[in-house]
Amino acid sequence: MEEQPQAVDIKAINEKIEKESAFVELLTLEINKVIVGQKHMVERLLIGLLGKGHVLLEGVPGLAKTLAINTLSQAVSGAFSRIQFTPDLLPADVIGTLIYNMKANDFTIKKGPVFANFVLADEINRAPAKVQSALLEAMQEKQVTIGDETFSLDRPFLVMATQNPVEQEGTYPLPEAQVDRFMLKTVIDYPKLEDEQQIVRSNLKGAFEKINPVVSVKEILSAQKSVTEVYMDEKIEKYILDIIFATRYPERYNLDELKPLISFGASPRGSINLATAAKCYAFIKRRGYVIPEDVRAVILDVLRHRIGLTYEAEAENITSEDIINKIVNVIEVP
């Protein structure tokens, strides 16, 4: 006899999430005391934090990327560290190293800047691959080995890496396999005119608002657990899988014209991260269940770095965003 699926009390889940997500508004208001505009970037940082993921931000210098994660760490009363990636950086500069202590005639461990709740990897594409992979391994494993000892990293642990657009000289592009480890890749644009006017005024005054801790690290860890309880219907799961499979086998979804443009589609990590990001987005919107609009809201940030383009696509100036938008327009919404 087949086991009957348990009935889900969506109303109870919704009430619980509505109560537990109340801090999001407080946190956003606190961050907005310093960050003008850039709502999309702040929202994506929160999704990364709640979904235990990491965020890759791409944009020209001077768009408040560093300020955003620093402000978030202050509002959450977490430890913050910044790593400026340069061509001469070594893996030990990121994760830490053993230092010889002459007095004790022994080696002591010096932990690197990766031991913090919020780590800013500034201009990650300016350092060689071995340094990039040292950080990305720490992100994936949530632990670091120095000498013979293995150390767990702090919780919560959010890495926000920034990257200048690849056209700029002196950069080492992140390999596809490494980029795939980022839950989200967000492209940051210039602020609107009225926002920039406000930025200029506040900078000229020189009076910056003090950021107060409004959420504890413990509350964030509890919220990360609550996000997993956000209800996702089977129809939404199927919708996510259809989108992912359409990036791999477009011909199955009457998208034959995309086949010559895609060299590889999104991996299962893409499916997991799309589902997680949709749950986080619902949580931020103080809802205990996922709707198709949640999936569509995060889809570009989750998938833009997971689809490989052929030379043909590049020659025609077709981007991964164009492909995602075509797929979303064709896949039936539940």
PLM features per residue range, with description:
Residues 1-17, 250-334:
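C-terminal engagement/docking regions of AAA+ P-loop ATPases
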Residues 13-21, 34, 171-172, 185-257, ...:
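Conserved C-terminal "switch" segment of AAA+ ATPases
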Residues 17-63, 245:
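Pre-Walker A (pre-P-loop) alpha-helix and adjacent loop at the N terminus of AAA/AAA+ ATPase modules
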Residues 44-47, 100-120, 149:
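Conserved alpha-helical scaffold flanking the Walker A/P-loop in AAA+ ATPase domains
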Residues 49-86:
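Walker A/P-loop
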Residues 59, 122-123, 134:
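Walker B catalytic acidic pair
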Residues 60, 94, 162:
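P-loop (Walker A) phosphate-binding loop of NTP-binding proteins
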Residues 101-105, 123, 127, 131, ...:
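Canonical AAA+ ATPase core
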